């Protein structure tokens, strides 16, 4: 799609064909049919070694083994900071298109604004707008790609990034200890942890049953922390897409999910959350995803293989190579789906009119 916004498309009565997904990819559960299967865990007392820490750690480990996804409350991130970050994000997407498009990141730019981030070659696009920026390592920050509107964006997002980095490392400590390792092991395996923040805006959609806000995927990195509003739309599956649940929004909570890197480091013990985002025709939705990723040259290989197990990777590889392979598989799948769609469309064109509308 050429640079632009979804604003004008959101007001149409029919969904643009660029967003219409094949039937097997369409939502099976509505955005507001919530499930309470995803654990909500209070972190109050997690620093009390002789207090509640043991029970909190047990709950986190169980959630990672069963789902790879859970929610945390009492996490220590200031509520005013969360409110400011949310307000600024909403204000950014309410800006006139020309203000957002000053930070257009199409064409390979690192950071900024884009409509429907998707793999090159994909036939179908996601129904979302995003603004993204890279906040760690600090030395690599390119403030020219960070929005300068609304006022206060940089100051608040810097503080938010710092607090989320701290929370992510604390959660990785828990998982390291559960694996029988030193508590810094998972963080150290990232070498020089990268942090990317993606603010997602999902406008109202004229035909939400035909599309997705964000297609089904697992995150490539170590761990992701998601702040979402109360609308609903985040969905997860743990049976390879046979059944989906919509995660119940919890005020002030962060949804935490493990990525592929975390999955491999645990030798498959902790699941990489399989998830997607659906949209609706009643209201827009906002979410802020903080991706904690390893450095490109970090090693991807199990940190510990338990007795009786085999390593789930044949050999160590770098995160850059792991990511390249993942994107390669996704691109090939997208190419095959695009060819299949073109073939179906071609057959429809070749049909007599009376058969097409029969």
From Swiss-Prot:
Its EC number is 1.14.11.9. Changing residue 350 to A: In strain: cv. Cha-0, cv. Con, cv. Cvi-0, cv. Gr-5, cv. Ita-0, cv. Kas-1, cv. La-0, cv. Ler, cv. Me-0, cv. Mh-0, cv. Nc-1, cv. Per-1, cv. Ri-0, cv. Rsch-0, cv. Rub-1, cv. Tul-0, cv. Ws-0 and cv. Yo-1. PROSITE patterns: FE2OG_OXY. One of its GO terms (biological process) is response to UV-B. It catalyses: a (2S)-flavan-4-one + 2-oxoglutarate + O2 = a (2R,3R)-dihydroflavonol + succinate + CO2. Residues 190-294 form the Fe2OG dioxygenase domain. 2-oxoglutarate binds at residue 285. Fe cation binds at residues 217, 219, 275. One of its GO terms (molecular function) is flavanone 3-dioxygenase activity. InterPro entries: DIOX_N, IPNS-like_FE2OG_OXY, IPNS-like_sf, Oxoglu/Fe-dep_dioxygenase_dom, Plant_2OG-oxidoreductases. Catalyzes the 3-beta-hydroxylation of 2S-flavanones to 2R,3R-dihydroflavonols which are intermediates in the biosynthesis of flavonols, anthocyanidins, catechins and proanthocyanidins in plants. This is Naringenin,2-oxoglutarate 3-dioxygenase. It comes from Arabidopsis thaliana.
């Amino acid at each position: 799609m050429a640079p632009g916004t979804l604003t004008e498309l959101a007001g149409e009565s029919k969904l643009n064909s660029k967003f219409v997904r094949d039937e097997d990819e369409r939502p099976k559960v509505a955005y507001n049919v919530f499930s309470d299967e995803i654990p909500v865990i209070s972190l109050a007392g997690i620093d009390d070694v002789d207090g509640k820490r043991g029970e909190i750690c047990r709950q986190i480990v169980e959630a990672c083994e069963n789902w790879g996804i859970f929610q945390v409350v009492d996490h220590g991130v200031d509520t005013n900071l969360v409110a400011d970050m949310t307000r600024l994000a909403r204000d950014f997407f309410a800006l006139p298109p020309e203000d957002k498009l000053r930070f257009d990141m199409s064409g390979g730019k690192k950071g900024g604004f884009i409509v429907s981030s998707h793999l090159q070659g994909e036939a179908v696009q996601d129904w979302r707008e995003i603004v993204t920026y890279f906040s760690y390592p600090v030395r690599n920050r390119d403030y020219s790609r960070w929005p300068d509107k609304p006022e206060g964006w940089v100051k608040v997002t810097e503080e938010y990034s710092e607090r989320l980095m701290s929370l992510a490392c604390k959660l990785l400590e828990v998982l390291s200890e559960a694996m029988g390792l030193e508590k810094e092991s998972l963080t150290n395996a990232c070498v020089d942890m990268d942090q990317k923040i993606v603010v997602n805006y999902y406008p109202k959609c004229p035909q939400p049953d035909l599309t997705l806000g964000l297609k089904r995927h697992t995150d490539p990195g170590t761990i992701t922390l998601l702040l979402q509003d109360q609308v609903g739309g985040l969905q997860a599956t743990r049976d390879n897409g046979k059944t989906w649940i919509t995660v119940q929004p919890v005020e002030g909570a962060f949804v935490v999910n493990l990525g592929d890197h975390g999955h491999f480091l645990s030798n498959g013990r902790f699941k990489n959350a399989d998830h997607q985002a659906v949209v609706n025709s009643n209201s827009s939705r906002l979410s802020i995803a903080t991706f904690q990723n390893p450095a490109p040259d970090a090693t991807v290989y199990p940190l510990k293989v338990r007795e009786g197990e085999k390593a789930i990777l044949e050999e160590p590889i770098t995160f850059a190579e792991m990511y390249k392979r993942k994107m390669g598989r996704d691109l090939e799948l997208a190419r095959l789906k695009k060819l299949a769609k073109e073939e179906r469309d071609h057959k429809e064109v070749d049909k007599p009119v009376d058969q097409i509308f029969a």
